[in-house]
Amino acid sequence: RSVHPSITYWCSGVTKSKISTFRQVFYDKGLKDDWFLNNFKIAHRSQGWIFSHAGMVNRQIPYGMTVDQVIDEVLPDVWLNFRNITYRQNPLISAVGIARGGEDNVGGLLWLDYYNEFNASPDIGKQVFGHSYVPEPTATALNTEYESWNLDTNLKDYAIIRDGRLTTYKIR
């Protein structure tokens, strides 16, 4: 979508109405709230899985760091500075890859393109994400220690994780 008259990025399902609502909730209201700032996470771990908006890949991880270090140490700082217009946006979350109309080598955690940039990896581990529309929940590296699921089915499906095992269900 257009963020400036001369800049266009592609993000499935984005409409002017959704952008307006997002802006109002997350910027005009939500991000001014200390609780929201202190508790919102760009990536979250639970039951052996990583949850993020668009997914994580090896190329996003700074050299010499582990995924755990990025989630626990780097992302909280990046998030706290996300709205600071004097702070250069960190490509870990804000990079827009060529597949989405950007100029970065790979998209960040908010912009990674599933079809052209994502690959499951034992270095990252199990994960759940969306951002790139798929008609049905789609698994990569199923039944491995780096099983990854894209659940962006336009609100048609959800998943439950029990004992580390992910199962998808249709929303009725």
Where are these regions (language model features)?
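Active-site environment of divalent metal-dependent phosphoester hydrolases
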Residues: 1-3, 57-59, 117-119, 128-140, ...
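Active-site neighborhood of divalent metal-dependent phosphoester bond hydrolases
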Residues: 1-87
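Hydrophobic transmembrane signal anchors and adjacent membrane-proximal interface regions, especially
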Residues: 9, 85, 98, 166-169
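Short beta-strand-initiation
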Residues: 37-39, 127, 146
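Flexible, charged surface loops at secondary-structure boundaries
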Residues: 45, 118-124, 142-144
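Active-site neighborhood of phospho(di)ester-bond hydrolases with catalytic His/Asp-centered motifs
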Residues: 51-53, 126-132, 150-153
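Alpha/beta-hydrolase fold catalytic core
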Residues: 76-136
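Binuclear metal-dependent phosphoesterase catalytic core
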Residues: 136-172
